[in-house]
């Protein structure tokens, strides 16, 4: 069946947001007395839900993890999200897809209101029919995508999930979407996306329209 609904990850797919995310982790570690980590280590935290990352770092200390999440989000909302910008070619890709009548949505592990504010601040909100993210009821990529599909009444067999990390691909598979599309300009790599079972890999935003038409 023809694809009609395209669900995009946000960080590493639409936005180059690494500087703000890494700075938010550094601030949180300083505030929480946690040793600083290398940029390479911090980059692995981009994509998974924040709760999972801090639960791992907390090593069983739930109170520490909860406080760290609050600290991170406070900094990110005030400063970190302002440091993001769309990748080269993203705006043109979104406009081309809209001209071909695809319905575009965001399905991100970012906190939902933060994702909405980021895209509004970057004047990108108008390209999306819905912006869905992490909420207490939906905190994994699989659950966020399920919520997105349900609320938009999008059928999985006419939908695709597009993202840069294995979580995006797995989320798409677990929701039985027609295609999972891995992007190579973000924070994952070809090996990660292939191992996750991505149906298609693209290296530049403009390739998306070519491969789904």
For each of these PLM feature ranges, what is it?
Residues 2-91:
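N-terminal helical cap/lid subdomain that shapes the substrate entry/recognition surface
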Residues 45, 125-139:
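A short, structured active-site edge motif that brings together acidic residues
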Residues 5, 142-169:
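Conserved Lys-Pro-Asp/Glu-containing loop-to-beta segment of HAD-superfamily phosphomonoesterases
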Residues 35, 125-129, 155:
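Conserved H-loop
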Residues 160-200:
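Acidic, Mg2+-coordinating phosphoryl-transfer loop and its flanking beta/alpha structural elements
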Residues 25, 93-119, 134:
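Substrate-recognition element of Asp-dependent hydrolases with the DxDx(T/V) motif
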